[in-house]
């Protein structure tokens, strides 16, 4: 579940990590648990993908082998999301951001998707930018994670990504030191780390409600 970037991991190769991407798997499972407790208008599938580093093989296979007469209304992707709003970074570090990128839809639908994000962030969750927390969303197509398998096939996607605010994380990226202790330290404690996860779960759940309540156009 690691993110594939266009430079060489400092540790040489890859390693299963807490931020990249056990964090994304954790959020996915928490959201799935919340969604499973209610009835919805649309069928919901939760997935953890294999072989992202080898070329998005798991997600690409899923998209390529959908059952006949089935389609995908929207897809949410969580990749490297530990350090985000409202966690305050240590002194001297850059802001911990909440970033959401939309892709895979026509212009009108992308505008609607971005408006949903704005409504959730500003009106429903009452989040706001601070010097320590940058909140941003935009339509953007980047193939750094499994959402690429979906938006390149014209399925609407929301990609959640929080880089961690500064260059220090990339010293741990794809190495054995990307572990829970490291992430707790960067978050200033386990409670703060939990607050960041709660941001993602509630934001994505509210977005899901907007998606489910619309028709299939």
Please provide the spans of the model-predicted regions.
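Catalytic-core environment of secreted peptidases
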Residues: 1-47
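Residue-level signal for short, function-critical loop segments
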Residues: 3, 50-52, 163
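Glycine-rich, flexible loop/turn motifs
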Residues: 14, 36, 58, 169, ...
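Residue-level preference for long, well-ordered alpha-helices that form the structural scaffold
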Residues: 17-20, 24, 51, 105-110, ...
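Solvent-exposed, polar/charged alpha-helical surfaces in well-ordered, non-transmembrane soluble domains
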Residues: 25-33, 37, 60, 64, ...
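Metal-dependent peptidase/peptidase-like ectodomains
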Residues: 39, 49-153, 157
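Generic secondary-structure signature for well-ordered alpha-helical cores
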Residues: 40, 122, 209-213
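Active-site-adjacent mobile loop/cap segments within catalytic or ligand-binding domains
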Residues: 72, 77, 83-95, 99, ...
């Amino acid at each position: 579940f690691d993110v594939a970037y266009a430079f060489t991991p400092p540790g040489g190769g890859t390693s299963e990590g807490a931020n990249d991407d056990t964090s994304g798997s954790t959020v996915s499972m928490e959201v799935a648990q919340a969604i499973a407790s209610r009835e919805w208008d649309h069928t919901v599938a939760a997935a953890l993908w294999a072989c992202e580093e080898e070329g998005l093989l798991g997600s690409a296979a899923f998209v390529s082998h959908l059952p006949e007469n089935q389609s995908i209304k929207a897809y949410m992707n969580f990749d490297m999301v530990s350090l985000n709003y409202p966690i305050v970074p240590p002194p001297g570090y850059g802001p911990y951001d909440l970033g959401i990128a939309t892709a895979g839809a026509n212009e009108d639908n992308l505008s609607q998707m971005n408006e949903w994000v704005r409504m959730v962030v500003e009106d429903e969750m009452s989040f706001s930018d601070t010097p320590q927390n940058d909140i941003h969303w935009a339509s953007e197509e980047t193939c750094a994670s499994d959402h690429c398998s979906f938006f390149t096939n014209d399925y609407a996607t929301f990609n959640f990504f929080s880089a961690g605010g500064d260059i220090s994380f990339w010293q741990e990226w794809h190495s054995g030191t990307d572990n829970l202790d490291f992430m707790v330290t960067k978050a200033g404690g386990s409670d703060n780390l939990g607050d960041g996860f709660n941001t993602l779960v509630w934001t994505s759940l509210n977005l899901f409600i907007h998606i489910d309540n619309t028709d299939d156009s």
